[in-house]
């Protein structure tokens, strides 16, 4: 397997700039759910490039434009930078304004967008269309957009890694196989919809305070679950790193959605220990874990197992459980 992106998506001059180390900084930007997808995409690209020469980060578009740039910047102050904007509608003011500002400082620009011929598509050098739902619509449910944005970011990152010689054809083939497995994995999670609904109906009203937690790539899952729970349930909900939660507000005895699927072996033991602490403080842990993982059982109020996938792709499956629980 290989990736094929034409020049309307990623042009040769950007690839050459990456290959020759003319681009050293790569930012994924967006707002809201697109900003969370940016976080997941940055984690994936860091894994794919696997090169400390690159500084790869995700920022809210408004943070990049508001606090990482100044009116005193020179016209080439970001000439070593690639900015990849993510937007469902292509009309998000903060994101589009940020693209204008980085271009004015010499940055190269790409976009991952759902709506064809939207404003942002005329501002950037290359566009990957996600086409979730009807891509002529201004608004498409951001649940669908979120998953496709992450996969688009993965394909883009994989292409960059291969084109610059940082990953070989064997690696690319295995990663594409993993991406192709995701729809079947997601269908398997959707098959648990009734059990997830039963959990939400049984537990949601028992706790005043809710939280979502995740660490590493799964912090993106926690952040996105928090957004949907807040939107759907009209509640202010926290999103924290798993290890940090015990230092924050366990005295409130919250209901905690723990995004643990895909966590690597060196970390999962600590997440289990932290979950035991949550339980000891009379919190209500609802766990999302890999199939076959039984060590959470003594501490989980409910546990949902998802198919095993790589750590960098696991946010998709963790988030899907959280989305269903929220609905």
Positions of PLM-derived features:
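A SIS-like phosphosugar-recognition module
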Residues: 1-327
């Amino acid at each position: 397997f290989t990736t094929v992106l034409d020049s309307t998506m990623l042009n040769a001059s950007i690839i050459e700039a990456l290959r020759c180390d003319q681009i050293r900084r790569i930012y994924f930007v967006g707002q809201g759910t697109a900003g969370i997808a940016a976080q997941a995409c940055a984690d994936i690209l860091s894994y794919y490039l696997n090169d400390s020469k690159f500084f790869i980060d995700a920022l809210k578009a408004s943070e990049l434009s508001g606090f990482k740039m100044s009116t005193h910047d020179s016209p080439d102050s970001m000439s070593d930078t690639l900015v990849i904007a993510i937007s469902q509608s292509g009309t998000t003011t903060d994101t589009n304004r940020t693209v204008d500002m980085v271009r004015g400082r010499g940055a190269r620009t790409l976009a991952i967008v759902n709506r064809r011929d939207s404003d942002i598509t005329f501002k950037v050098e290359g566009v990957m269309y996600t086409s979730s739902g009807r891509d002529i619509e201004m608004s498409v449910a951001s649940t669908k957009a979120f998953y496709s944005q992450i996969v688009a970011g993965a394909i883009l990152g994989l292409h960059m890694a291969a084109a610059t010689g940082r990953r070989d054809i064997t690696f690319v083939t295995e990663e594409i196989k993993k991406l192709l497995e995701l729809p079947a994995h997601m269908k398997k999670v959707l098959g648990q919809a009734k059990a997830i609904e039963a959990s939400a109906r049984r537990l949601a009203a028992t706790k005043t305070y809710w939280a979502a937690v995740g660490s590493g790539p799964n912090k993106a899952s926690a952040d996105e679950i928090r957004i949907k729970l807040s939107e759907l349930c009209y509640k202010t909900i926290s999103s924290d790193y798993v290890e940090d939660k015990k230092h924050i507000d366990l005295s409130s005895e919250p209901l905690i959605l723990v995004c643990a699927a895909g966590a690597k072996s060196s970390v999962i033991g600590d997440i289990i220990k932290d979950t035991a602490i949550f339980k000891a403080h009379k919190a209500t842990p609802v766990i999302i874990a890999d199939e076959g993982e039984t060590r959470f059982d003594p501490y989980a109020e409910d546990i949902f197992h998802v198919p095993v996938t790589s750590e960098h792709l696991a946010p998709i499956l963790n988030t899907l459980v959280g989305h269903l629980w929220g609905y």
